[in-house]
Amino acid sequence: MMKIEKSSQPKENRPYGLWPSPISPELISQAIRLQDLQWAGTGSTLVWSESHSGKGRLLAKPDGEAPYTLSGTLNVKAGIGYGGGEFSAGENCVIFAEKDGRLYRRSYGAGKPMPITPAFGCSAAPALSPDGKWVLFVHTYEDQDVLGFVDAVGNLWPEKLVSGADFYMQPVWSPKGKAIAWVEWDHPNMPWDGTRL
């Protein structure tokens, strides 16, 4: 049987929140927040987003190599609602949302991010097609959300695919790229109250 010894220290009562803590606001502000992890292509490269001091960046870690930054000096951040849906990792490239509202493409390895959408409104939740040629995304402009699509290299003007709902989120492609799905809902509902798939 284990013997438990009583402490010689007097018992101290303090109100909630007044105990000294090693966790300070300064420590929290220095933390790096990991936000999403995706395998690129055949699963040989891990891609993730992280946030530090309010700035988001996108990193890649190929198998057997050191991690490197994909986003350069850009601030990776989805600009719709509470954010989320910041990037889509494909076989040869990644598509990501930047704080300026545009979507950018970056090939793995050497290179720099290139915009694929114009600078108006805000974009989020990019979804790269299985063949890597098209991108679905959520876009908002003047308080109107739509589901849009654009070619993955930005040669064509983005087009509105679906509109009419108040909010859209999480567009995805079928495995063969022949169909798409998304979630939508209207005021006054929240996503957990009343959505359509």
Positions of the model-derived regions?
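Short N-terminal amphipathic alpha-helices
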Residues: 47-71
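Multi-bladed beta-propeller domains
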Residues: 3-33, 62-82, 106-122, 148-169, ...
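Conserved beta-propeller blade repeats
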Residues: 29-45, 74-93, 120-135, 165-180
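N-terminal presequences and immediately downstream first alpha-helices
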Residues: 4-9, 39, 45-47
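Short, solvent-exposed loop/turn segments that connect beta-strands within catalytic domains
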Residues: 43, 154-155, 178, 190-191
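Short loop/turn segments that connect beta-strands within the blades of beta-propeller domains
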Residues: 42, 54, 90-91, 97-100, ...
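A flexible loop/linker signature enriched in serine peptidases of the S9 family
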Residues: 50-58, 75-81, 95-104, 118-123, ...
